[in-house]
Every structure is written in C-alpha cells, then in structure tokens.
Amino acid sequence: MSVNRLVKHDATPASIHKLIVAAERNLVDARATNISVENRFDAAYKAIMQCAMAALWAKGYRTLTSEPGHHQLVIQILPKTMDVENDVVIVLDALRKQRNLNDYSGDTVSDATLTECIVQSGQLIKRVRKAGLGS
C-alpha cells in the first residue's frame, strides 16, 4: 500500500455499513431510466467508489482526498483490500477514466459503458456484503 497516500483510519462497523447502504442506493439510482445516461453512470461509479472505500476503511486506512489520484489508488488497492482480480481492476480503472472524461471534458457515456459500470458496482456490492463488511 502506498503509505504516503494512505492514512490510518479507525472506521466503525456502523460507518462502513452506512457507506455500503449508500452504495446500494446509488446502484438503485443508476438503474433508474428517467435520468440521463451520464447521471446514471455517475451513480454507478459512485457506488464502486463507496464499496472500494468501505473495503479500505475495513483494513484501517483511508485515502488522502486532498491528494490527486485518490480514486485511482482506491481502485488499484482492491486486490489487497478485497482480493479483487487484476482483470476486474483494469475494467474499474477504465470506468474511472471514463468518469474523468465525462466530468472534466463533457464526453458522453455509451449505453454499453453504463451497463458495464452498473454490473461492476453490483458485483462489488455483493463482494462487500459477502465479506461481512460493516456487519
């Protein structure tokens, strides 16, 4: 773990649970068809980040959000926090890059990318629930 970009964090099970419940709400929002694809993508991506943060908190750390690259770090550390396979990390990192293009360049999000983001967020939520995080 990149110690200079992580700090110790004593998260309570209740705070981890709250973050996972928020991820579940965001996944519900991502599936709502009455909002734009981009907003649905943002909600699904946010669910991914909330799950990744919950996993990191459960290991006793959090990122320095004042430092650039904290989203990338939380995704890249998933193999250590949740035993996520490297091929999944590659997909999640591609979704992170798409989120940046959408947020900072106004790029649109394809239906296929939205679907992938929803699938990945759902799978991460299942992983954190199966791991018993926040219980």
Show where each model-derived region lies:
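Terminal alpha-helical segments
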Residues: 1-135
